[in-house]
Amino acid sequence: MANYMIARFDEIDAVKCPCGFAKRAFAGPDNSAATMHIVDIHADSRAHYHKKLTEIYLVLEGSGQMELDGDKIPVTPFTAIFIKPGCRHRAVGKMRIINVCIPPFDPDDEWFD
């Protein structure tokens, strides 16, 4: 098995998520390191948190706010956000982001108040 993986986001189907729609790369049983997503946020997302997952967002297009543990932070293209486990967060506005999840995204680690 190769020591690398390649993903072509133009060949990945988008799935519904609390933030809008996501294309998730490197998700599979052979990867325990991280996943990378392109997320299209079309409306205000639902506040949530993760008990195990760390997320790194990079805003590519659009603008809005990130709500992070109650703080409202304006975001524009090329803003990066590091979200630790336990941080309640949501995106507000219309934007496209890259989301890196460490360890890989697990829908069972998505918690809502």
How would you describe each model-predicted region?
Residues M1-A34:
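A short, N-terminal "cap"/entry segment at the start of jelly-roll beta-barrel domains
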Residues T35-K51:
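Conserved short histidine dyad/triad with adjacent acidic residue
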Residues H37, L60-E61, T76-P77, G93:
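A cytosolic small-molecule/anion-sensing beta-strand core signal
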Residues A43-S45, T79, C87, M95:
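Surface-exposed loop/turn positions
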Residues K52-Q65, D69:
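Glycine- and acidic-residue-biased ligand/ion/polar-headgroup-sensing regions
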Residues P85-E110:
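Ligand-binding loop in jelly-roll beta-barrel domains
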